[in-house]
């Protein structure tokens, strides 16, 4: 999870703390309706916990300030990209890294740039083999290819961080090192959902303020 800002970064946004500053307009979807937005939220929460004296109370206070800076809470990532890139609303958009790269490439590198925060979360799209159809559909071969050198090269060229060490080293300039947490740090998705996104959870408390 990274930040997409306007070219030249006129608001000097460098890390999560800047997103809670007065006068900063942040674009992110609604965590109640968007899976991608939940990764954004959890990455911000993780950063807040890692600050001096950080705990659940200070993280909730920080997220409250951040969401007060969100002028439009779209239902999904595509809507947020339209709001930010086409409607020109917001100073910064919280985004999956590959989506930020693609937006910059397709909409104009002269319009946007990417800021990598000090802390983020490892957001991994799931992939699995279903036994009953594995032979018929060749899904096992696909999965093996995905993690081959050639497959990992394709992954990197499409702006996903490769897992293969050699390929990762080759693309080190594209993907700066970053302090990553995982969903396991939140006790897994079931616990994260119950704590943060279920009715009456932390997001509801934050947004009701």
Predicted region positions:
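A conserved helix-loop-strand patch within extracytoplasmic ligand-binding domains
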Residues: 1-49
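Residues embedded in well-ordered beta-strands
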Residues: 2-4, 113, 126-128
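Solvent-exposed loop/turn segments at secondary-structure junctions
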Residues: 3, 8-11, 31-36, 98-101, ...
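Soluble non-cytosolic domains of exported or imported proteins
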Residues: 7-10, 31-38, 57, 75, ...
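Sec-exported extracytoplasmic/periplasmic mature domains
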Residues: 8-9, 21-24, 44-50, 68, ...
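Extracytoplasmic/secreted proteins, especially bacterial periplasmic and envelope-associated proteins
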Residues: 14, 35-39, 43, 58-65, ...
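Ligand-binding pocket segment of bilobal, Venus flytrap-like solute-binding proteins
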Residues: 51-117
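Extracellular/periplasmic juxtamembrane helices and adjacent flexible linkers that interface
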Residues: 132-209
């Amino acid at each position: 999870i990274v930040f997409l800002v306007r070219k030249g970064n006129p608001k000097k946004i460098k890390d999560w703390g800047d997103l809670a500053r007065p006068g900063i307009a942040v674009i992110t979807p609604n965590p109640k309706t968007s899976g991608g937005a939940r990764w954004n939220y959890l990455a911000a929460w993780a950063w807040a916990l890692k600050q001096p004296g950080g705990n659940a109370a200070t993280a909730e206070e920080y997220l409250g300030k951040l969401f007060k800076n969100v002028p439009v809470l779209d239902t999904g990532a595509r809507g947020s990209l339209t709001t930010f890139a086409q409607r020109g609303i917001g100073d910064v958009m919280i985004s999956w890294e590959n989506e930020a790269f693609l937006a910059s490439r397709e909409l104009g590198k002269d319009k946007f740039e990417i800021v990598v925060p000090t802390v983020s979360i490892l957001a991994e799209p799931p992939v699995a083999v279903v036994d009953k159809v594995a032979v018929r559909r060749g899904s096992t071969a696909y999965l093996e290819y995905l993690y081959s050198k050639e497959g990992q090269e394709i992954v990197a060229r499409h702006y996903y961080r490769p897992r293969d060490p050699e390929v990762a080293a080759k693309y080190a300039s594209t993907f700066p090192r970053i302090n990553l947490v995982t969903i396991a740090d939140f006790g897994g998705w079931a616990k994260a959902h119950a704590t943060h996104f279920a009715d009456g959870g932390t997001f509801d408390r934050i947004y009701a303020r």
